[in-house]
Amino acid sequence: LCDKILKENNITPIGFDDWWKKWWKHHFEDTSMEYVLLPWEGSRHNPIGHADGIVRYVDQGRVLLTNYADLDPEHARLLKERLQAKGFEVEELSYLPYFDPKQDNTFRSLFDHTWCYINFLQVRTHLLVPQLGYPELDREAVRQIKVVYHKSGIHCQVHPINLDMSPIVIMDKKNNGGGALNCLTW
C-alpha cells in the first residue's frame, strides 16, 4: 500500500494499523497478513499513487521495483529501505544505462511513464507487459522482467502486449486516464 491512503482517509499510521488488523481479522479470521506502507512522492513519476505502479511481488522475499532510481534516486532509496526493513530482497528496473533522455527525444517524452512496465498483468504463469510504443524501450523492459523472474526460479512466459498503452498510461483526469494494464483489470 502507499502511504497516500493515510492522507486520503485522514488517518494516522497507528489508526490505520488498528483498522487494518480489525478488518483483516473480520474477513480472514484464521490468517494473518503484514502490509508495507510505501512512501508516495506524489509527483509525475507516479501520479496515481497505487503500489502496483511502484512495486511487484515476485516470490517469497523478493519484489521488483520500478525504475525510480532513474527518476528520483532519493525516493528509490526510501522505497528500498522500507521494503528491505520488511525482509524483502529488492530487484530494480533501470533504463538509463540503455537510453539517454538528453539525447533521445522519444525516450525523453516517455520517461515519466516508464513506471507502466511494472504494472503488468499476471495470469498464472503468464506476464502480460504493457508497451509504450517505443520498440527498443519496450523490449528492454520485457528483457529485465524476464531476467528477474528467471533469477527467482519462476517459470513463466513474459508477453509484451502488442498495443501502444501510452494513451491509457498518460494521466488524463477528464477521461479518467492514468494507470496501465494491471489497473485496467480492477
Language model segments and positions:
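Histidine/cysteine-enriched polar flanking segments
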Residues: 1-186
